[in-house]
Amino acid sequence: MESPPLPPACTKQGHQKPLDSKDENPEKHCPLTVNPWHMKKAFKVMNELRSQNLLCDVTIVAEDMEIPAHRVVLAACSPYFHAMFTGEMSESRAKRVRIKEVDGWTLRMLIDYVYTAEIQVTEENVQVLLPAAGLLQLQDVKKTCCEFLESQLHPVNCLGIRAFADMHACTDLLNKANTYAEQHFADVVLSEEFLNLGIEQVCSLISSDKLTISSEEKVFEAVIAWVNHDKDVRQEFMARLMEHVRLPLLPREYLVQRVEEEALVKNSSACKDYLIEAMKYHLLPTEQRMLMKSVRTRLRTPMNLPKLMVVVGGQAPKAIRSVECYDFKEERWHQVAELPSRRCRAGMVYMAGLVFAVGGFNGSLRVRTVDSYDPVKDQWTSVANMRDRRSTLGAAVLNGLLYAVGGFDGSTGLSSVEAYNIKSNEWFHVAPMNTRRSSVGVGVVGGLLYAVGGYDGASRQCLSTVECYNATANEWTYIAEMSTRRSGAGVGVLNNLLYAVGGHDGPLVRKSVEVYDPTTNAWRQVADMNMCRRNAGVCAVNGLLYVVGGDDGSCNLASVEYYNPTTDKWTVVSSCMSTGRSYAGVTVIDKPL
């Protein structure tokens, strides 16, 4: 029986035409079939052949590792091997090729990748994998390594990643690590990596217009810390470093009380000249300051890093573990990892890229435990305990140390103060306050730590007194009193001014707000909040002062409102927390990338 005839060649009209027709090309009109699995299957078979040492025509050697392979596969996937095997080098004919620049295990991983397109990048192997991928010109692997390192950026390692990226010509990673260091400057300068930088690298960093800092104090203190880390060698660089510190942008009080008293400044005539320049700037009328143009009078213009407000624990109505974050850009709340244990009435700070929950009350006991939260890992970790049990304490960061101020230990109000060194993971006592203060609010302005109001437990009265701590002198000094007694007031700092928000005097819960100006040592009233609040959290972000939760004397509040100093007006945020809570810890953090 004859086979059926082949179908005719395709034509537009469906008629038969000879295949050699000059006016029609059948390839134009017949569909092209592409099998996406063909290459994958082919490489799978080639890898199986390699594993059985079949048809292999070269052995790649590194250290004591011997890896059989196929020249054509290596040449097809790696420009390095392509040049080696198709050129006139002796390796093009050799049965064994030794690679001296790469260790055996790393080379095996990369040749495995050539055959399988699979590779696992980890913290342990990325520093050897990336340069090896660069040598073999496996750009996809190098890119994967860079993306992994970018995901690991943190204040404690970004400078090291920046140097690594520079060494291996990873331009995109270099730029991202540099931007990260600028955006997290206040935390980066607390790291060992910063203290171990060379002078050129420090100057490059502190001269950037893009530094994200709350005040130029951060730059000055970073310079002093870097020099003191190896004082005998580095003090000769003081003048060169101070050229990049914008002293005219610092408050006059800070210049007099901190900069002028710094021994490293006193011992340098050039540094004194920069200080004189700054003092002259402050003495000039505003309109004349515009004429005094220099790099040190120019405002830094950082990129706006997205922020999150973190609300930790609190009473609702008992101590809770819940942690909520508010995204200012998206205007919504979301839950993150819970506290390891119930905690309310704790101190709260953001330091070195971590949130610290300090002391507090767990529902039955006042505690001295401290937990830290890593926003990148969404994970809580315990650190060293305080020396004393404290609840309703104040917590703040001054000169790279975390201070726990006053509070209540379960039997009496406390005047004691202790500080935490994150590098040594140790707490130590400093000078006590002049007054016992529980339910105290604290804030840092101009290099001084302020303790505002509270309850002394002895007179059984709420306090209107305020005192400030000078870390250099290790002493507390009374300053001007508030206009009214406030215990459980929220305290925040905005534009170098100290705000005392709400609080109570006995059963009277307040919605009034007053603000302290260190330059005049005086308090003044500003607009009242929309509702009475005590034991609320306070934080400043984007030029606004936020007040979170608290209670009004009868119930816990889930609402949030913010104060705009330009309009002297309070506005209630449309989105509330998932639950009303008072005595919660509140702070603002950089949104994880």
UniProtKB/Swiss-Prot annotation:
Repeat as UniProt keyword: yes
Alphabetized UniProt keyword annotations: Actin-binding, Cell projection, Cytoplasm, Cytoskeleton, Kelch repeat, Repeat, Ubl conjugation pathway
GO MF, any single term: identical protein binding
Chain positions covered by the region annotation Disordered: 1-29
Predominant subcellular localization, coarse grouping: cytoplasm
Domain BTB: 56-123
InterPro entries: BACK (IPR011705), BTB-kelch_protein (IPR017096), BTB/POZ_dom (IPR000210), Kelch-typ_b-propeller (IPR015915), Kelch_1 (IPR006652), KLHL2_BTB/POZ (IPR044072), SKP1/BTB/POZ_sf (IPR011333)
One Pfam family, short name: BTB
UniProt-listed CDD domains: BACK_KLHL2_Mayven, BTB_POZ_KLHL2_Mayven
Entry comment describing in which tissues the protein is expressed: Detected in brain neurons, oligodendrocytes and astrocytes (at protein level).
Superkingdom to which the source organism belongs: Eukaryota
Function statement: Substrate-specific adapter of a BCR (BTB-CUL3-RBX1) E3 ubiquitin ligase complex that mediates the ubiquitination of target proteins, such as NPTXR, WNK1, WNK3 and WNK4, leading most often to their proteasomal degradation. The BCR(KLHL2) complex catalyzes ubiquitination and degradation of NPTXR. Responsible for degradative ubiquitination of the WNK kinases WNK1, WNK3 and WNK4. Plays a role in the reorganization of the actin cytoskeleton. Promotes growth of cell projections in oligodendrocyte precursors.
Protein name as annotated: Kelch-like protein 2
Organism: Rattus norvegicus (Rat)
Name of encoding gene: Klhl2
